[in-house]
A protein has these predicted regions:
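Catalytic cores of RNA-modifying enzymes
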Residues: 1-163
Length: 163
């Protein structure tokens, strides 16, 4: 599982942004102290509640992540957000009063490359802002068959760890 490619530990608080049906949430619950599963969609919420009802360390927040307050205690992010929201999510995280200790996002590869501070890739303004606070890298390339339905573009597990 992808979570094995992270530094998420048993003592961690982890936010799952856009938790959907709870596949990632359920896996995270086995690896960390508490998962906050954030999901605004009512249909997905029903599935999420059903799939996580026996997981005592999961808290479901039925809100839009972009509108909610972030924790004041240390936390990490692991999410498979809609690609069109990736930039807004990262902006919110790095501009937060208490930014996360680590960010793990499943991203479109082309977008993730712009977040790296390397000589080989054009780094975006967001990438420069991110790399001022975080060490960034592509943790793991993903295959289309890792998803249902498969994405139309190459995807990666992106990591940003606080410097």
């Amino acid at each position: 599982m992808l979570i094995g490619h992270t530094n998420i530990k048993k003592r961690d608080l982890v936010l799952d942004i856009g938790a959907g049906s709870g596949v990632i949430t359920s896996a995270l619950s086995k690896r960390c102290q508490k998962v906050i599963a954030i999901e605004p969609d009512k249909t997905a919420l029903e599935k999420l509640r059903k799939n996580t009802k026996n997981l005592e360390n999961v808290e479901i927040v039925p809100e839009d992540f972009l509108m909610m307050d972030l924790p004041e205690t240390p936390y990490k992010i692991f999410a498979n957000p809609p690609f069109h929201l990736s930039s807004k999510i990262l902006h919110k995280l790095i501009e937060a009063k208490n930014p996360p200790d680590a960010i793990y996002l499943i991203l479109q590869k082309q977008f993730a490359l712009k977040l790296l501070n390397t000589d080989r890739h054009y780094t975006s303004q967001l990438g420069y802002a991110l790399t001022a606070k975080y060490q960034t890298k592509i943790r793991y390339p993903l295959k289309p068959y890792d998803f249902t339905p498969p994405p139309a573009v190459p995807t990666v597990l992106f990591e940003a760890k606080k410097i």
